[in-house]
């Protein structure tokens, strides 16, 4: 009989930020979790490093094949387009809601926090996310987070509030990844 490792769904679409996926994925794998790439469609998605396309990533499961009860958490990397594209798909936002309602960890970095806000799982929680209003005001997450009932934390490398783990930038990947693992172990 094979031991089954707990699974994390990495919700990813085109133009996701590679550093925000691969660093936490490695940390989660090392901590004993399998990470499955889940997207709206089961087609390869474009990998970006900031605004430069660097390749393609295979998708393990389309959202319609993913069952919330099979996952102990969700990883939502940022990127210029990925979180917004996913937030337009009601199957994805419902999946995030269902995993959260089951007590699963919702971990978002940078603009990934947009998907959590638009999935309505941040009310009455402290959180952070992409906040560089000077350089890219159109990508800032704070208005969506506050509209969804969250309390915005501006200058913190990681914010943990119950099952929600958020970080504003990939430069905090080590602290973010450690916080995800700690939150998962505390479940």
Across the structure, where does each feature detected by a protein language model lie?
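Extended, subdomain-level signal for the structured scaffold at the beginning of enzyme domains
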Residues: 1-106, 114-124, 134-187
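Beta-strand segments within the central parallel beta-sheet cores of soluble alpha/beta enzyme folds
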Residues: 126-128
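Catalytic nucleophile serine of serine hydrolases
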Residues: 110
């Amino acid at each position: 009989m094979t031991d089954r490792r707990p699974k994390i769904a990495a919700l990813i679409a085109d133009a996701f930020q590679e550093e925000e996926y691969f660093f936490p994925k490695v940390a989660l794998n090392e901590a004993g979790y399998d990470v499955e790439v889940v997207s709206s469609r089961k087609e390869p998605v474009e990998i970006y490093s900031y605004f430069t396309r660097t390749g393609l990533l295979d998708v393990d499961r389309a959202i319609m094949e993913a069952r919330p009860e099979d996952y102990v958490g969700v990883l939502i990397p940022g990127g210029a387009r990925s979180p917004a594209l996913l937030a337009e798909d009601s199957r994805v936002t419902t999946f995030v809601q269902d995993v959260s309602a089951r007590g699963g960890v919702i971990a978002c970095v940078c603009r990934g926090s947009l998907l959590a806000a638009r999935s309505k799982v941040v009310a009455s929680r402290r959180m952070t996310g992409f906040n560089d209003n000077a350089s890219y005001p159109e990508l800032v997450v704070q208005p969506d987070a506050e509209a969804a009932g969250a309390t915005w934390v501006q200058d913190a490398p990681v914010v943990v509030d119950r099952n929600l783990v958020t970080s504003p930038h990939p430069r905090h990947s080590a602290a973010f990844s450690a916080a995800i693992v700690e939150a998962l172990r505390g479940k």
